[in-house]
């Protein structure tokens, strides 16, 4: 399970709270987005500005880390630095699936991973040329190309020779799993590229993906991707008291 921006259905996306909860819900990896501040700090934020997550129009590339760190996000959270997320991932034994949202963040991200001696990470982007540059620089981490709707994944990723093809086809149709054909899976295997699937919460779509030889599935609700832990008699080990009442009102 790859927690999309952390457990973002329950906590403000891309925050330490969202990543901590993702670990508690059983996610093996956290997907996160990185950008570079005006003074060269790699910050974890999806959008270029903080308008959507904080109601503040401050733009990441135009602001210093000191300015960004003072902004309170919705849910009483703050924008973390990449180093902070790495430290939390090390403590919780979690992996990082890092999406580059700015070209200038690429080499900084790679350098920080090396400096922190963090091994369990993937670096990806929709921009094949950014990933190609990391490949040419002999980046030691697995590289991923995110594939938008309507393009051939193999043609789109040719320039970068990625290790992973990440299909972002959630909104391609009401049954996007049907686009993950046997031919697509077979070709990706032949070319030595693993498959990662978009963020998904629809049970019927997840059932359609069940059994496919894919590396991972992203979700805002990572717990739905995890099998129930069971004892030797097949009895669930976990019983939720009044439901998952730390996420929603009890007994509802």
Regions found by a protein language model. Name each.
Residues 1-252:
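Phosphate-group recognition and catalysis centered on beta-loop-alpha active-site segments
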